[in-house]
Amino acid sequence: QTALTIVSHKAANYSVVIPATLGALALGASRSDTDSLRMVLSPWGHAFQLRDDDLGIFGDPRVTGKSAGDDLREGKRTYLLALTWQEANASERAKLAHGLGNPELSENELEELRAIVKRRGRRRHEEVISTFEAEGFLALESSNFNADQRELLSEVAAMLIKRSK
């Protein structure tokens, strides 16, 4: 729950919702439109940060521009790792406890941690991302945005959620 609270403040608000709302206000959007925009973008902002956490462990460094596994070496406490910890057995938890936050992790140790995350947390993490994506689309469907605006916001969703960097 704490990890999701961090996601809410870090990404949903600061990285997605607030900048988009400010942009909409600057272009003269109504209060109703900015309220609708927040309802649509908040779950997509959550999904954006969760995708970022996945890319921090599994992303292609040639695409992301950062070393895959840095989040593990830095010991970032992400929702993906919280899910992994919940499902991990005692042996896997010991490996996670030893490896997370260890900047000296070898590539083999890093791969072992990735395998644990993939086995124990990644599937559920993807389900949560899909749930947030669907919540945003439900909000979009019930909004007063016109067809062109909905299409544009759907493209924004893809950029936020279906990204590889």
Regions found by a protein language model. Give the residues of each.
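All-alpha prenyltransferase/terpene-synthase fold signal
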Residues: 1-165
